[in-house]
């Protein structure tokens, strides 16, 4: 198994993103980034089967969630309010109608 990294660019917020490559002896290769744990590419016999973009900026501006890793939750949390026990947490409101969508402005997707 070969593992290596390459720079992927800089986000609008000035954070550096990295690509992580994993390749086995058969040539199957996965490419991920630390920007939202996004799957950039998955190749079998030299053919990429993942739909996505070429630049970090494209991933920042997308609305389709290509390559996104679902984490914490998927979908909306109404009005960005999450109750755990007796405590209510106000989350960022990044979706329609003030909902928190897919982890907020910065997250898995």
Protein language model features and the residues they cover:
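Surface-exposed acidic/polar loop and edge beta-strand patches at domain peripheries
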Residues: 1-109
């Amino acid at each position: 198994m070969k593992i290596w990294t390459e720079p992927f660019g800089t986000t609008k917020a000035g954070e550096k993103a990295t690509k992580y490559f994993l390749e086995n002896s058969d040539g199957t290769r996965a490419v991920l980034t630390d920007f939202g744990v996004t799957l950039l590419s998955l190749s079998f016999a030299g053919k990429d089967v993942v739909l996505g973009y070429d630049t970090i900026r494209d991933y920042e501006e997308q609305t389709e969630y290509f390559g996104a890793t679902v984490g914490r939750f998927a979908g909306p949390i109404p009005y960005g309010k999450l109750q755990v026990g007796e405590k209510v947490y106000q989350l960022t409101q990044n979706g329609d109608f003030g909902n928190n969508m897919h982890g907020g402005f910065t997250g898995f997707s």
